[in-house]
Amino acid sequence: MMEAHFKYHGNLTGRAHFPTLATEVDTSSDKYSNLYMYVGLFLSLLAILLILLFTMLLRLKHVISPINSDSTESVPQFTDVEMQSRIPTP
């Protein structure tokens, strides 16, 4: 038994390597499990990015045109930066 084990002590190309259980043909349920995982990960990241995009767009919309309770008021409203530039300096 030990003689057969030490027979190929040099180059190992003569040995026959049989496939293990991990390299055998997958079943139909295991074949698509990685695909489902990657598709689910992609869709969840896409949903998070879309939520962030819409949140940023809504914030930008409120910065550009803020919501006023008195919409009939015709007096133009300015931000602090615009008001400081309109103040005359002596």
Swiss-Prot record:
Transmembrane residue ranges: 38-58
InterPro entries in UniProt: SERTM (IPR031741)
Subcellular location: Membrane
PANTHER family in the cross-refs: SERINE-RICH AND TRANSMEMBRANE DOMAIN-CONTAINING 2, SERINE-RICH AND TRANSMEMBRANE DOMAIN-CONTAINING PROTEIN 1
Lineage of the organism: Eukaryota, Metazoa, Chordata, Craniata, Vertebrata
Sites where a glycan is attached: 11
Protein name according to UniProt: Serine-rich and transmembrane domain-containing 2
Provenance organism: Homo sapiens (Human)
Gene Ontology cellular-component annotations: intracellular membrane-bounded organelle; membrane
Gene name for this UniProt entry: SERTM2
Recorded superkingdom: Eukaryota
Pfam families in alphabetical order: SRTM1 (PF15872)
Keyword terms of this UniProt record: Glycoprotein, Membrane, Transmembrane, Transmembrane helix
Membrane topology per record: Single-pass membrane protein
Region Disordered, annotated ranges: 69-90
